[in-house]
A protein has these predicted regions:
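Extended, hydrophobic/aromatic-rich amphipathic alpha-helical segments that build helical scaffolds
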Residues: 1-11, 27-45, 55-92, 119, ...
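Outer-membrane beta-barrel translocator domains and adjoining extracellular loop/strand segments
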Residues: 13-17
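Extracellular loop and loop/strand-boundary signature of outer-membrane beta-barrel proteins
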Residues: 18-23
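Long, intrinsically disordered, low-complexity segments
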Residues: 27-29, 33-35, 107-165, 239, ...
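An aromatic- and glycine-enriched ligand-binding surface/loop that stacks and positions planar moieties
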Residues: 39-40, 58-205
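Surface-exposed patches in mature extracellular/periplasmic domains of secreted proteins
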Residues: 47-54, 99-103, 284-286
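Flexible, polar/acidic helix-loop-strand segments at domain edges
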Residues: 171-248
Length: 359
């Protein structure tokens, strides 16, 4: 994330001594450090393809393979595409991973560490004591609170209230086919729920308080589901038990399809792409073009932190991230926006040795 956000950052792999200033590497230099480190780890041949249930959350070979493919593809390093494809196909050939039959089950509590899950960050509400004064202690996550509607009537539609941030765009909801189960598993139409309830029970007049950029739609994948923080012992809004899904098997398939389409090697890109496409109930096969693969990634991974980086690495950011009709986005993305500006306090702390990004 530091590499993706800031690109040109200080790097050190040994403890620093006074004055504690590390050499600033370029984004390309840092990439080489990361990718060769991963290659060294893989060559050790000590990681299991998947951990047993008592060790879920530990690094596995499949997780390292996915991280390797992610950074190689983000860097557009075609010299390593064939290696990344080999790693994806090792996961695909493993009996330890597969697609969940029903997409709607993936983000339920019962879907945590399913056969589709390659890596998750564990969160728990059981005796969780994370609080405002101790945010780094083990416990739950605050994400459901952040993204659920503000002053929502708790328990309605089995959802609880949050702070109303990060609503889902209506255009995202409408991008899905009506029979695509990913639509409702991703986009919760909260306003429609209240409208239907109030039509049946007009005296209730249920509502929630709208916040900035409200659309009536919220991210269902990590929503504040009633009861998912019932066993916490501290601040309920900070201790939800929703695990954060980092890598899923569907991404392995789409990575493989894309790498083959980009010329990384032989393989059935169409098969891999349509395994994901058809799992969503879409019976008409699609061709493995880069545009189709990136669109399938869009539909598959809304809210999972993939889309923005896909737009950058595929050169689509400048044409997609443009001023919107609502007045929220007023500037177009440009290549100078790829990296954030380095905070001035960090430049000061580095005794002026850091070169600022051209933001």
């Amino acid at each position: 994330w530091v590499w993706k956000f800031w690109g040109n950052v200080p790097y050190f792999d040994k403890n620093l001594t006074a004055p504690y200033v590390a050499e600033q590497l370029t984004a390309d230099q840092l990439y080489e450090k990361m990718v060769t480190s991963l290659e060294e780890v893989i060559q050790l041949n000590v990681l299991p393809m998947r951990e047993d249930s008592e060790n879920y959350g530990r690094v596995t070979l499949a997780m390292v393979y996915m991280l390797y493919a992610e950074i190689v593809m983000y860097q557009n390093d075609d010299s390593r595409y064939s290696t990344a494809l080999k790693y994806m196909e090792e996961i695909i050939s493993s009996p330890q991973y597969d697609l969940m039959p029903d997409y709607t089950d993936i983000f339920k509590e019962t879907g945590e560490w399913s056969i589709e899950s390659i890596f998750e960050i564990n969160y728990k509400d059981d005796n969780a004591v994370r609080d405002w004064g101790s945010p780094l202690v083990a416990g739950g996550t605050a994400l459901p609170t952040l993204i659920s509607p503000y002053i929502w009537p708790n328990g309605t539609d089995n959802h609880d209230r949050g702070w109303g941030f990060c609503p889902v765009r209506k255009e995202t909801y409408e991008r899905y086919s009506n029979n695509d189960p990913r639509r409702n598993a991703t986009c919760w139409n909260a306003q429609a729920v209240l409208d239907a309830h109030n039509a049946e029970h007009p005296g209730d007049k249920l509502s929630y308080t709208t916040r900035y950029q409200d659309t009536g739609f919220f991210l269902e994948k990590y929503a504040a589901i009633t009861g998912n923080n019932k066993d916490q012992k501290s601040s309920s809004e900070l201790n939800w038990n929703n695990n954060l899904r980092i890598y899923r098997y569907s991404e392995t398939l789409l990575n493989a399809a894309e790498l083959i389409t980009r010329g990384a090697g032989q393989g059935d890109a169409k098969k891999y792409l349509n395994l994901v496409h058809k799992r969503a109930g879409l019976v008409t096969e699609i061709e493995p073009t880069l545009d189709n693969i990136i669109e399938e990634r869009h539909l598959e991974f809304v809210g999972e932190g993939k889309r923005y980086w896909d737009l950058i690495r595929t050169g689509k950011a400048a044409s997609v991230l443009v001023p919107d009709a609502y007045g929220y986005r007023t500037n177009s993305w440009s290549s100078s926006k790829k990296y954030l500006p380095i905070p001035q306090k960090e430049i000061d702390a580095a005794k002026g040795t850091l070169v600022q990004n051209n933001y």
